[in-house]
Curated annotation (Swiss-Prot):
Taxonomic path: Bacteria, Pseudomonadati, Pseudomonadota, Alphaproteobacteria, Hyphomicrobiales
Chain positions recorded as Zn(2+) binding sites: 147, 151, 157
GO MF terms held by the record: metalloendopeptidase activity; RNA endonuclease activity; zinc ion binding
Cofactor binding note of this UniProt entry: Binds 1 zinc ion.
UniProt cofactor(s): Zn(2+)
This enzyme's EC code(s): 3.1.-.-
PROSITE patterns from the UniProt entry: UPF0054
UniProt keywords, alphabetically: Cytoplasm, Endonuclease, Hydrolase, Metal-binding, Nuclease, Ribosome biogenesis, rRNA processing, Zinc
Top-level class of the enzyme under EC nomenclature: hydrolase
Functional note: Single strand-specific metallo-endoribonuclease involved in late-stage 70S ribosome quality control and in maturation of the 3' terminus of the 16S rRNA.
Gene Ontology biological process terms in this record: rRNA processing
Record-linked Gene3D superfamilies: Metalloproteases ('zincins'), catalytic domain (3.40.390.30)
Protein name per Swiss-Prot or TrEMBL: Endoribonuclease YbeY
Subcellular location: Cytoplasm
Amino acid sequence: MPNITCREQPARARRGGEKHIMIRSATPVTEILVVADCWRAEAGAEAVIHRAIATAAGMVDKDTGDAELAIMLTDDAGIRTLNANWRGLDKPTNVLSFPALQPTGPCLPDDPPRMLGDIAIAYETLRREAGDERKTFDHHLSHLAVHGFLHLIGYDHETDGEAEEMESLERQILAQLGIPDPYAPPERMT
């Protein structure tokens, strides 16, 4: 497991009381911004996300070291606004990814870290889906973080072939985290 350090920004550096945490490791620097109070009930969410991103970064055939990404933990109202503004869909969703533009030339040693992009995750939708699918909150959060990360590095699921490739990689990453297949049907309760 990578060496993890966590520091919270001083209150004067935060906007409007938002909790702002930077987590650093040998894999991408992951900035987590909590913008919805409902996330405060999930004290370990940041650590779950970091572990999922670090594991995913270590398993993909892409250079993600010395890169950065930002994850916004929001609510259904916040993600609905993003979904409407960026995708034209006026409804909440579980996760949205916004990949950054890729550099056109070589990266030089003095260049700033490259930005992979941004991910937004909606608390209520995540919580509801986890319950409906009989998954733990942390397992579903890990899945959504991995799913969003894979979008940032170029994976997609627009075609059956793309979906098969992306879902297979998600299963492998989540298995490494000890999380069951997220696409398997939920077990029946008797």
